[in-house]
Design a protein with these regions (language model features):
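Short acidic/polar inter-strand loop motif in beta-rich domains
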Residues: 385-399
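Compositionally biased low-complexity segments at domain edges in trafficked proteins
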Residues: 410-437
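Hydrophobic, well-ordered secondary-structure elements that form the walls
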Residues: 98, 159, 209, 381, ...
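Amphipathic alpha-helical substructures
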Residues: 148-238, 247-250, 268, 281-286
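Beta-strand-rich binding/interaction modules
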Residues: 205-206, 221-384
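Acidic/His/Gly-enriched intrinsically disordered linker/tail segments
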Residues: 38, 95-167, 183-184, 213
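Acidic/polar loop patches that form or flank catalytic/metal-binding clefts of enzymes
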Residues: 25-31, 87, 109-117, 170-175, ...
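Juxtacatalytic substrate-recognition/specificity segment
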Residues: 1-77, 81-91, 97-101, 105-110, ...
Length: 437
């Protein structure tokens, strides 16, 4: 068992160190990993797959699968052994949270480790499925059709989106550690997780729980239109001519209807109005409202003098600079609210990213318009350039259409072998020179 001799114990130690960093210190005296045909967890002991070929070589998929399953099964000591949720009722609180911490641990193992759960783009194919093939994460575990994505991948992805895109690493990590601390050796429900994350972070995340956990809507934000304008510092006078208009005399400000309270207050002999008790409070408008003040009702003539542009080109640039104004219109076609992540590519080849919080959708969840002010002329715009939001349709994310791989190319990119198997010949068996350490 060369793979286990080389990696198992070190992966166990790495897992305990990583999970302790993101949750609470490991409280048990031991953690054991045993080689078996598949993965299964118990307190302080787990069984994991990953065997070499008869000649002692192994595929990359076998090695990575073995490392991943050891991390996952050892991680179950934290979820659900220590933070003891009910897996039969809420599988995602066990498998989903553990898959999220597994992802963090794999990322800290090797920056090139081929993770399968966690990154937003990995969940896109699942989110694209027809609605009749999807259930909310909050569905009872016995009724889940797509068990793997629903209980493992989607919850892990949601937490990663919160950490990387919505809350930020520092705030999310603090809140998640607080959840683990508060609910260690207790029996939390989903509400306890949601409440603790909000309470510890001070963030209102209702919109995210509702969209990601209680709904099946995908993220599909489109960039519909781009309008832009630049300050013209070379124009001559843009002044106005002298204008005159009539301003009528303002009428008394009165309610257009005496409601029941006003009528009853007048009839109530026990009520004495302040302006009756102290007549010094009665000013001109008290009398005017009652028709007791005589005024000249003829309109007043107002003259607005001509206004001319007296600024030079240099003065205009000094005041406003060389600015470009871009008005972008976005549509929420998928239904799931997400932050707007806008990447600008300017004509000089430089790039810049703006991040707009999801709260921009609070008044209209279907369409929003946002204006950006830039110092350079834009060449192209792209939404979600790092694929953080699990957007299911990237074709409507750009201004200046970009090419997309054909379906055949996408299929080739997604092809992978079965669990623990490679999708090609074993390169370890074909080594002809010793690799450089």
């Amino acid at each position: 068992y060369p793979l286990y001799l080389k990696y198992s114990t070190k992966v166990v130690a790495h897992t305990i160190k990583s999970y302790s960093k993101f949750t609470i210190p490991y409280p048990y005296p031991v953690a054991q990993s045993l080689e078996a045909a598949n993965g299964m967890e118990y307190p302080m002991i787990c069984f994991n797959f990953g065997r070499t070929e008869k000649d002692g070589t192994y595929s990359e998929a076998t090695k990575n699968g073995m490392i991943g399953v050891v991390i996952h099964e050892v991680g179950h000591n934290f979820f659900p052994m220590i933070i003891n949720s009910d897996e039969r009722q809420w599988t995602w609180m066990d498998e989903g949270l553990n898959s999220y911490c597994e992802y963090l641990t794999e990322e800290l193992w090797d920056n090139k480790f081929p993770v399968s759960k966690g990154p937003a783009y990995k969940i896109v194919d699942y989110m694209k499925l027809p609605k009749d093939q999807l259930e909310p994460i909050m569905t009872n575990s016995e009724n889940i059709i797509q068990f793997g994505p629903n209980a493992y991948s989607k919850p892990a992805t949601g937490l990663n989106i919160l950490r990387e895109t919505i809350m930020g690493r520092e705030l999310f990590d603090y809140a998640f550690k607080e959840y683990a601390r508060r609910w260690a050796f207790k029996h939390p429900t989903p509400a306890d997780l949601f409440r603790t994350m909000e309470d510890a972070s001070g963030e209102d995340l209702d919109w995210f729980w509702r969209g990601w956990f209680y709904n099946t809507d995908p993220c599909d934000i489109s960039l519909d239109t781009v309008r832009w304008a630049a300050l013209n510092t070379d124009s001559e006078s843009f002044g106005t001519k002298e204008r005159m208009f009539s301003l009528p005399v303002a009428k008394p400000i009165l309610n257009n209807f005496d409601d029941v309270s006003k009528q009853r207050n007048r009839k109530d002999k026990n009520i004495v109005f302040a302006t009756d008790a102290d007549t010094s409070l009665r000013d001109f408008y008290w009398h005017y409202a009652r028709g007791l003040a005589k005024v000249d009702t003829s309109a007043t003539e107002i003259i607005i003098p001509a206004n001319t542009d007296t600024l030079s080109r240099e003065e205009k640039q000094s005041i406003a600079g060389n600015k470009y104004f871009y008005e972008l219109t976005f549509s929420n076609k998928g239904g799931l609210v997400m932050p707007l992540i806008v990447e600008w590519t300017f004509k000089d080849g430089t790039k810049e990213i703006d991040r707009v919080a999801a709260q921009i959708w609070r008044k209209n969840e279907s369409k929003v318009v946002k204006t950006f002010v830039k110092n350079k002329e834009m060449a192209s715009i792209k939404l979600d350039p790092m694929r953080e939001t699990a957007d299911i349709d990237e074709k409507n994310n750009t201004w200046n259409v970009e090419t997309e791989p054909s379906k055949f190319q996408l299929f080739k990119n997604r092809t992978r072998g079965p669990r623990g198997a490679s999708n090609g010949a074993n390169p370890m068996q074909k080594e002809i020179a010793t690799y450089i350490k």
